[in-house]
Amino acid sequence: MKKTTLFILLALVIGATSCKSKRMLPVTERAEPDIPVREERFTFTREADRVSQQNNTFFVIMGSFQSRENADRFSETLRELGFSPSILLSETGFHRASVNSFLSEDNARSRVLQIREEFPDYADTWLLIKKDD
């Protein structure tokens, strides 16, 4: 009798704890994708770009190259896609292909996400913050 009672009690405990709750789980917001950010000093390779963008702080970077020639070729590809790229020469010696610049970090981040969505081949687009001298 004790064994039967113990078995029934054990079955009830296991059955009660294994049932899933029918409560709705709270909806969690989708996490914003990571956007790599780098802060560095750089110079504009064209005077016209410097004049038009010198007051901006946040730059959307679609490519980074050790060779200026490679950066120029990539810029041509970006022009064919409808962008107006600028080449920035970083303090580390890399030629950064920037397609937009902004005063606001939020606007720059939005643009990075938009590019990633519209141009999946450029999902590695990132954000460069101009370091003050």
Report residues per predicted region.
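Post-signal peptide N-terminal segment of mature Sec-exported envelope proteins
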Residues: M24-Q54
